[in-house]
C-alpha cells in the first residue's frame, strides 16, 4: 500500500503532493515501483496535528481519487475517520476506507461503509497510553472495533485490522506491537502494518524521518514473516523488493 498524502503538513512528506499533477505523478511512480493499493490521506494525523473541516478534506481528496481512477487501474484507499468524507470518497470511486479510529470516532462511519459494500481497515487507537496488559488490551479494543463493523452489517471478509503503531502508544508499546505481530494475526482477520518512517524507528536508530528507510524495511520483513497481508509505506520500491526477497527465501505466508 503506497502512501499518497495530499496534505500541506504530514509528518514525512507534507506539501509534496498536495496538487493534482504532483499527486498523479507520484501515483504513477508508486505503481511502477510495485504498489498494489494507493492510500490517499487528506488530513495529517501526525502527533499534534490540526483537524480540518469535512469540506476541506473532501476538496483535497475527492478530485485526486477521481483522477487516479480515470488514469490508472489500481484500487484506491482513503485514510479518513469522518463519515461525510468517507461517503464523498466512495462516490468519487474509492475502493476501501482506512479509519485510524477503528470506527469509534464517528458513529455514522460503520453504516456508511456497510451501505457501500466496500472493505475497511480498522486501526487501533486511543486517547491515552494507560494499559494494564498491553497486548491483551490492544486485542480486546481491536475486537471492539471489529464488532462495531459486524453489527453494522460489514461482511467479516471485508474487515482488515491494524494494530496502530504510533497511535495511542508509547515507544515500548510500539516495540511490543512489532514483537507480537503474530498475536494480531491469530484474531482471524487480515493485518495491515504501518510503520513507515515512524518515530519508533527514529528513536531506535536515532535518525531523522528521511533516514528511516532501512529501519522500515526491517519491520516489513517482520510483517511478512508474521503473515501480515499489507504494509503501508512511503518508499514503495524498496519495500516491494524487500517483500519479494523475503518471500523468495521463505515462501509466501511461510508461517
Task: Label each residue range with its predicted role.
Residues 11-26, 45-63, 67, 72-75, ...:
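Active-site-adjacent loop and "lid" segments of alpha/beta metabolic enzymes
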Residues 25-41:
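Catalytic domains of carbohydrate-active enzymes, especially glycoside hydrolases
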Residues 31-35, 145-158:
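Phosphate/pyrophosphate-binding loops at sites that engage ATP/ADP/AMP, CoA/4′-phosphopantetheine
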Residues 164:
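Conserved Motif II region of HX4D acyltransferases
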Amino acid at each position: 500500500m503506497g502512501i499518497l498524502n495530499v496534505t500541506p503538513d504530514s509528518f514525512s512528506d507534507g506539501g509534496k503532493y498536495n496538487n493534482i499533477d504532483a499527486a498523479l505523478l507520484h501515483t504513477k511512480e508508486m505503481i511502477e515501483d510495485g504498489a498494489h493499493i494507493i492510500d490517499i490521506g487528506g488530513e495529517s494525523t501526525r502527533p499534534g496535528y490540526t483537524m480540518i473541516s469535512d469540506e476541506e478534506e473532501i476538496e483535497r481528496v475527492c478530485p485526486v481519487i477521481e483522477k487516479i481512477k480515470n488514469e490508472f487501474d489500481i484500487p484506491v484507499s482513503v485514510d479518513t475517520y469522518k463519515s461525510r468524507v468517507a461517503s464523498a470518497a466512495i462516490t468519487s470511486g474509492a475502493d476501501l476506507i482506512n479509519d485510524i479510529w477503528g470506527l469509534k470516532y464517528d458513529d455514522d462511519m460503520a453504516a456508511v461503509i456497510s451501505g457501500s459494500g466496500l472493505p475497511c481497515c480498522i486501526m487501533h487507537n486511543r486517547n491515552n497510553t494507560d494499559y494494564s496488559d498491553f497486548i491483551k488490551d490492544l486485542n480486546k479494543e481491536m475486537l471492539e472495533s471489529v464488532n462495531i463493523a459486524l453489527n453494522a452489517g460489514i461482511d467479516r471478509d471485508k474487515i482488515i485490522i491494524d494494530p496502530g503503531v504510533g497511535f495511542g502508544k508509547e515507544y515500548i508499546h510500539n516495540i511490543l506491537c512489532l514483537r507480537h505481530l503474530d498475536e494480531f494475526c491469530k484474531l482471524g482477520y487480515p493485518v495491515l502494518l504501518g510503520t513507515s518512517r515512524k518515530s519508533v524507528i527514529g528513536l531506535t536508530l536515532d535518525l531523522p524521518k528521511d533516514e528511516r528507510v532501512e529501519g522500515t524495511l526491517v519491520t516489513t520483513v517482520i510483517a511478512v514473516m508474521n503473515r501480515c497481508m499489507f504494509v503501508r509505506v512511503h518508499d514503495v520500491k524498496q519495500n516491494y523488493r524487500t517483500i519479494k526477497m523475503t518471500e523468495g527465501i521463505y515462501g509466501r505466508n511461510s508461517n
